[in-house]
């Protein structure tokens, strides 16, 4: 197990938050506390057509989110941050086998990344109250 404190922040982007999310201010505050205490911070950002294109305002991280010097960034195109990205290579290169995860959306991208990370042998801790989602209609 690594001794570095590693925090992975998923999809805390302007475009993602165009849909209202639960307790945004509290969630961001807790994430900022985590990133300030971390040795390594990895920001995961989703890209897709329709407002989340790389370089767009929608793709950018929330302005109130603390981005420490030396933070690492991974761009993804699917819910799972490991799928067709350089995340696993980055973790291997950095000697990271465990991390704390937080961000948006609890029931989609955070969940998919946790499941796929654990299946690859990573030890993942979910930061309580440092993840959020939107109201979603129940399936019919």
Residue ranges of predicted features:
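Long, well-ordered, tryptophan-enriched scaffold segments
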Residues: 44-45
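Short glycine-enriched, charge-decorated loop/helix-capping segments at active-site entrances
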Residues: 20-26, 51-52
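Short acidic, Gly/Ser-rich segments with clustered Asp/Glu that frequently serve as metal-coordination loops
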Residues: 13-19
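N-terminal nucleotide-binding beta1-loop-alpha1 segment
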Residues: 8-11
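Active-site-adjacent betaalpha module
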Residues: 1-6, 30-36, 40, 52-140
């Amino acid at each position: 197990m690594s001794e570095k404190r590693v925090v992975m922040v998923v999809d805390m982007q302007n475009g993602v938050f165009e849909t209202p999310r639960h307790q945004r201010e509290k969630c961001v505050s807790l994430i900022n506390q985590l990133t300030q205490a971390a040795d390594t911070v990895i920001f995961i950002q989703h890209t897709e057509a329709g407002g989340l294109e790389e370089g767009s305002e929608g793709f950018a991280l929330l302005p109130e989110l603390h981005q420490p010097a030396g933070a690492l960034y991974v761009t993804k195109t699917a819910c799972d941050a490991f799928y067709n990205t350089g995340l696993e290579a980055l973790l291997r290169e950095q000697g990271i086998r465990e991390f704390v995860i937080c961000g948006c959306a609890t029931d989609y991208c955070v969940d998919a990344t946790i499941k796929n990370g654990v299946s690859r042998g990573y030890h993942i801790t979910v930061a309580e109250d440092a993840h959020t989602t939107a109201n979603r209609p129940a399936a019919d």
